[in-house]
Amino acid sequence: MSGLLTSASSSASKTLESAMGQSLTESANAQASKMKMDTQNSILDGKMDSASKSLNSGHNAAKAIQF
């Protein structure tokens, strides 16, 4: 009986260890993907901000021209 209990305990430990490892890997992959997406969004926000400033500057320059 003791050998059966030890075997079951060892099997359960291996199962939990595997599940924790998979969970940790999935979490790390998700965090890495989020970091990449946040960086890309930040870059795009900067480009959009620059484009908006450029358009506003052109619009303001056009308004300043007096005929």
From Swiss-Prot:
Coiled coil: none annotated. Residues 1-67 are annotated as: Disordered. The keyword Ion transport does not apply. It is found in: Secreted; Fimbrium. Keywords: Fimbrium, Secreted, Virulence. Residues 20-43 have a biased composition (Polar residues). The keyword Amino-acid biosynthesis does not apply. GO terms for cellular component: extracellular region; pilus. Disulfide bonds: none annotated. Residues 1-19 have a biased composition (Low complexity). Belongs to the HrpA type 2 family. Major structure protein of the hrp pilus, which is a component of the type III secretion system (T3SS, Hrp secretion system) required for effector protein delivery, parasitism, and pathogenicity. The hrp pilus functions as a conduit for protein delivery into the host cell. This is Hrp pili protein HrpA.
